[in-house]
């Protein structure tokens, strides 16, 4: 029985034992699979965590080691390759088994060999096939000698065994007669061997005509799955028990003689078959090697394609990065161009304002240098201008008074409209109350006498609750209003069981309390309306008084104004404000364009700065200028960072100037320092501006910016 086990490292040993003894001759074929691997590998090809082939231990060529389909196919291919090799070796071994079987069928009893140790002549043939397919190739190695030497020795042993059998049969006693009969199984086997020899000869001739064909893996799988050819059915009886072997065999009856095949012819036929099988094996090995070379070539091509694809992908990513960098550079360049254009426009506007200011200053100087008669003329012109301005102001006042009167009229009209709306609302409420009153009367008059008695026994609060419930009764309710009133009265009656037995009144007393209640309600509503009208009149009077006060205040303001001097001051203030706004906008533009690229909250520009201290962030009008650390960096040398800071603060109007003085006290540390002094314009509580002095940048930052930031 041949059994193939697919495991990690396959050690297939093909043992062919040919033993001739006095008792019987046994021929057996054993194929043993020895697993020499240290790890116990499962024979499950559907293992999901399969990273190596379970047959050849070869790492899978698929990119995904967990790919189930790829691992199964690879294992089947290895299985096909190994099974083909084993199948061919099995065919080779059958010929030796047949030889022994022929001797058994013909009842050829080998004679005992004269040996000092054993009386039996046994020829043991061991073929070890070790398939350690780390590279996918199957190699056949013998433990003691090579395959070719083994084949030559095997052939010599077979000839020697048959010669010894022939001589032993001839020199045996008369009891050991040889029956030259041939079995029908041997004839069938000879016919099958002749057919196979013709097919092999035809196939070999066809292969020589054609160029060496390549057997694909699919064909190998079909060969593996196809049933084997009908071999000679060799019945090898199992070895009998010891008792049967010891019993003497009965003497066989002589059989009729048949045509006996000479042993030399049989050996030649077997040798020819063996040669043909060896040739087929060599051809199949060559085809297998060619197929492996083609597969290796395809794998190399795939690897080259994969490398080329990776190179192209890297190039594509590099191009994308270059394009993104170019886009960013262009965007930055466009922003810089826009900022430069805005800066140029604001510079032009600032220059225009400076020119206007210079012209005004020149005109004032020229006016001061003119003689007195020109000044008199100017005074006259100024007086005329003042009169004209007064007339204009008077006209403006009249226009404003007219506007105020129009507003008052509009307010009065609005108040009248509001009063009318309120009266309409009151009338609507009265109409609704009358309708509700008539509705209630109609319902209560329809009530039977017991319910009227219950109604009369209710208190005023209970009646008001009943009125509201009846009026809020939805029309979609299947219960009619009369039924609803009756149910409500029944509920009140249950609550007032004690009063129901004491009170008994007539039916006609229903309308009197209702009329009294309505009259009281109307009187209350009239009083409320009168109160509302009085309140509205008071509000109108207050509004008129406020309007009169506003007019008086406006007239006083117009009278207090000095026309010419105040206008000139206002004009100068406007010019200063415009200049400050332009300076601040220029500062923002210049610092965004120039300072931020190398000072954006990262490093201090001071000399000998370890850059490990906490930085102060400078803010001007809620806008970050840059950061600086609190170390004094060479006040005498006046480092780059301080120079940038002072220039920024001077442009922003926070610090006006830098002077040297030894008589001024620092506002931050209260010390007199004869070094660089900075002073700041700040708005005081009186409305003006005061000057504060600081001896260093640390005092300035600690007192102004850093403390403010902490308080926030």
Curated annotation (Swiss-Prot):
Region (Disordered): 1-46, 107-264, 370-389
Organism superkingdom: Eukaryota
Name this polypeptide is given: Putative uncharacterized protein DDB_G0268364
Composition bias, Polar residues: 178-187
Biased composition annotated in UniProt, kind: Low complexity: 10-46, 107-143, 161-173, 188-198, 241-264
């Amino acid at each position: 029985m041949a059994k193939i086990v697919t495991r990690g490292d396959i050690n297939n040993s093909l043992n062919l034992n040919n033993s001739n003894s006095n008792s019987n001759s046994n021929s057996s074929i054993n194929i043993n699979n020895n697993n020499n691997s240290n790890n116990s590998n499962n024979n499950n090809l559907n293992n999901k965590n399969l990273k190596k082939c379970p047959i050849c231990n070869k790492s899978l060529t698929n990119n995904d080691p967990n790919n189930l389909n790829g691992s199964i196919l690879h294992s089947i291919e290895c299985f096909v390759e190994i099974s083909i090799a084993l199948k061919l070796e099995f065919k080779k071994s059958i010929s030796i088994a047949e030889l022994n079987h022929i001797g058994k069928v013909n009842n050829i009893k080998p004679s005992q060999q004269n040996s000092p140790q054993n009386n039996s002549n046994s020829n043991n043939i061991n073929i070890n096939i070790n398939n350690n397919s780390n590279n996918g190739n199957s190699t056949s190695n013998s433990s003691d000698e090579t395959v070719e030497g083994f084949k030559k020795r095997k052939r010599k042993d077979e000839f020697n065994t048959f010669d010894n059998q022939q001589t032993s049969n001839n020199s045996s006693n008369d009891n050991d007669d040889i029956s030259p009969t041939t079995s029908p199984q041997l004839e069938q086997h000879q016919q099958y061997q002749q057919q196979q020899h013709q097919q092999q000869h035809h196939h070999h001739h066809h292969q020589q005509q054609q160029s060496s064909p390549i057997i694909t893996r699919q064909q190998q799988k079909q060969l593996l799955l196809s049933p084997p050819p009908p071999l000679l059915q060799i019945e090898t009886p199992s070895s009998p028990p010891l008792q049967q072997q010891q019993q003497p065999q009965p003497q066989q009856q002589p059989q009729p003689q048949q045509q006996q095949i000479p042993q030399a012819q049989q050996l030649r036929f077997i040798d020819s078959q063996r040669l043909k099988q060896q040739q087929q094996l060599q051809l199949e090995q060559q085809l297998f090697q060619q197929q492996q070379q083609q597969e290796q070539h395809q794998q190399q091509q795939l690897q080259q394609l994969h490398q080329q694809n990776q190179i192209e992908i890297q190039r594509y990513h590099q191009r994308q990065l270059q394009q993104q960098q170019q886009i960013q550079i262009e965007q930055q360049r466009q922003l810089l161009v826009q900022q430069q254009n805005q800066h140029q426009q604001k510079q032009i506007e600032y220059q225009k304002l400076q020119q206007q200011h210079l012209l005004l200053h020149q005109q004032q100087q020229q006016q001061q240098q003119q003689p007195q008669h020109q000044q008199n003329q100017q005074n006259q012109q100024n007086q005329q201008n003042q009169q004209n301005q007064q007339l204009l102001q008077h006209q403006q006042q009249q226009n404003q008074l007219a506007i105020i009167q129009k507003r008052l009229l509009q307010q009065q009209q609005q108040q009248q409209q509001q009063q009318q709306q309120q009266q309409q609302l009151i009338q609507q409420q009265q109409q609704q109350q009358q309708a509700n009153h008539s509705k209630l009367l109609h319902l209560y008059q329809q009530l039977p006498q017991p319910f009227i008695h219950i109604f009369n026994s209710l208190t005023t609060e209970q009646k008001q609750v009943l009125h509201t419930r009846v009026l809020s009764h939805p029309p979609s309710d299947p219960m009619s209003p009369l039924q609803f009133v009756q149910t409500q009265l029944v509920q009140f009656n249950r609550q007032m069981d004690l009063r129901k037995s004491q009170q008994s009144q007539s039916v006609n007393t229903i309308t009197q309390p209702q009329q009294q209640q309505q009259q009281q309600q109307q009187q209350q509503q009239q009083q409320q309306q009168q109160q509302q009208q009085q309140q509205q009149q008071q509000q109108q009077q207050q509004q008129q008084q406020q309007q009169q006060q506003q007019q008086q205040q406006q007239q006083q303001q117009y009278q207090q104004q000095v026309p010419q001097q105040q206008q000139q001051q206002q004009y100068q203030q406007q010019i200063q404000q415009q200049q400050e706004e332009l300076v601040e906008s220029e500062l923002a533009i210049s610092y965004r364009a120039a300072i931020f690229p190398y000072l954006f909250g990262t490093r201090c520009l001071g000399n000998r700065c370890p850059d490990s201290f906490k930085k102060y962030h400078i803010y001007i009008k809620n806008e970050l200028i840059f950061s600086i650390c609190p170390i004094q960096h060479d006040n005498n040398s006046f480092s780059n960072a301080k120079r940038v800071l002072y220039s920024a603060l001077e442009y922003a109007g926070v610090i006006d100037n830098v002077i040297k003085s030894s008589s001024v006290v620092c506002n931050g540390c209260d010390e007199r320092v004869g070094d660089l002094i900075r002073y700041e314009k700040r708005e005081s509580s009186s409305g003006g501006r005061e000057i504060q002095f600081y001896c260093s940048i640390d005092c300035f930052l600690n007192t102004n910016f850093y403390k403010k930031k902490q308080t926030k």
